[in-house]
């Protein structure tokens, strides 16, 4: 039996139509859910507030209760914090140090520095610290210093700048830079009823901050040496006197040039 072409085409079309109907029936159905609106979110947010006003609290938003001990500590902190905030911050305006080892409150050291830097303080050693402390203890008890260890004839006056020593230069002497051409001369009377004086000079070779004081104890005045000059002093010097054998300048000679004495009218 022979089929013509038209019959075959009709059969193919019918089979394709059945296939399309079958495929549409077997596809999954998609259900579209409605999108929530903003008004719905607002109503959900307002629900806890409305429940609080109505007296019905949501158990999920209830805060945990504190134990009695924690509650007391919180109350104490709340009471302390306002008082602390109201109290003013202390300000340090003055600092006063009182200690035996403080160098700025040591009167003995202050006196040592003063005697070292002051050119009008006679060069001499002070008493040991333990002796000076005994002096102070005696003064605190009796109101006066003890007589032991004091000179029976103390210095009558403080040292003064009496004049200068001018270096004598010989023609054959080589030039030296470490010997100054002039040196300040200081003197102080040994005691009130004496005609002897203590003399000293200041080392100015290097122009340092600390100028050393050199006592003139072993000098020769016009070729004459005086014994025990460190205890009793030497006779008063006058203009034109020649001094040599100074400990600082042993090979040099100096002539004395005194300042004029000011006379009151």
UniProtKB/Swiss-Prot annotation:
Its main location: host cell. Keywords: Glycoprotein, Host membrane, Membrane, Transmembrane, Transmembrane helix, Virion. The chain crosses the membrane at residues 1-21. One of its GO terms (cellular component) is virion component. Glycans are attached at residues 74, 142. The keyword Transmembrane applies. It is found in: Host membrane; Virion. It comes from the Viruses. The keyword Transmembrane applies. It is a single-pass membrane protein. This is Uncharacterized protein L330. It comes from Acanthamoeba polyphaga mimivirus (APMV). The lineage of its organism: Viruses, Varidnaviria, Bamfordvirae, Nucleocytoviricota, Megaviricetes.
């Amino acid at each position: 039996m022979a089929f013509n072409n038209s019959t075959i085409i009709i059969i193919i079309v019918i089979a394709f139509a059945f296939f399309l109907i079958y495929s549409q029936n077997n596809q999954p159905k998609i259900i579209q859910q409605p999108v929530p609106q903003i008004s719905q979110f607002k109503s959900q947010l307002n629900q806890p507030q409305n429940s609080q006003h109505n007296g019905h609290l949501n158990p999920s938003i209830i805060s945990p209760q504190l134990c009695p001990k924690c509650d007391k500590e919180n109350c104490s902190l709340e009471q302390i914090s306002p008082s602390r905030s109201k109290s003013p911050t202390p300000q340090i305006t003055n600092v006063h140090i009182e200690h035996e080892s403080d160098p700025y409150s040591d009167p003995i050291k202050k006196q040592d520095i003063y005697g070292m830097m002051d050119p009008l303080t006679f060069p001499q050693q002070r008493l040991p610290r333990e002796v000076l402390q005994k002096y102070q203890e005696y003064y605190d008890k009796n109101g006066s210093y003890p007589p032991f260890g004091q000179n029976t004839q103390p210095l009558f006056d403080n040292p003064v700048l009496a004049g200068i020593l001018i270096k004598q230069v010989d023609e054959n002497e080589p030039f030296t830079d470490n010997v100054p051409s002039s040196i300040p001369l200081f003197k102080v009377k040994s005691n009130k009823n004496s005609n002897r004086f203590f003399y000293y000079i200041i080392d100015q070779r290097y122009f340092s901050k600390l100028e050393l004081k050199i006592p003139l104890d072993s000098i020769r005045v016009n070729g004459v040496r005086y014994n025990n000059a460190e205890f009793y002093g030497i006779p008063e010097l006058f203009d034109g006197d020649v001094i040599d054998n100074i400990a600082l300048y042993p090979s040099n000679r100096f002539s004395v040039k005194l300042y004029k004495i000011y006379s009151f009218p």
